[in-house]
Amino acid sequence: MSNLKEQVQAVVELIENGYALPGMGVHEYLEDVLEIGYQISGDKRYLGARLLVAFGGPNIWVDTRTQTVEGYWWGEKFEVYYHTDELGLHEACEELASSLFDCV
């Protein structure tokens, strides 16, 4: 489980501290995301997004609505809450959802 735990923690640190590479920001990070599922209310309010950021060993999901990073590897699961979003992931996903779905 330690490898799963380390990889999930690395994603949490990236979200809480912002992107570590110079000249790279949230939009560059989103270019590498494998899947984005938007959570939108019946009255078209953006609630959050669920992003697949790693696949195949382990699978790692970020949920901006619940502020969690979830890792799955075989039968194991490891989940961590993040407290700040210095990367700006929630806002960037909201911006994308607004342009795709006319969210309010």
Regions found by a protein language model. Give the residues of each.
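Acidic, low-complexity, intrinsically disordered interaction modules
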Residues: 46-79
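A broad "ordered helical/assembly scaffold" signature
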Residues: 4-17, 57, 62, 89-92, ...
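Negatively charged, low-complexity tracts enriched in Asp/Glu with abundant Ser/Thr
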Residues: 1-53
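Polybasic, proline/glycine-rich intrinsically disordered low-complexity segments
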Residues: 67-104
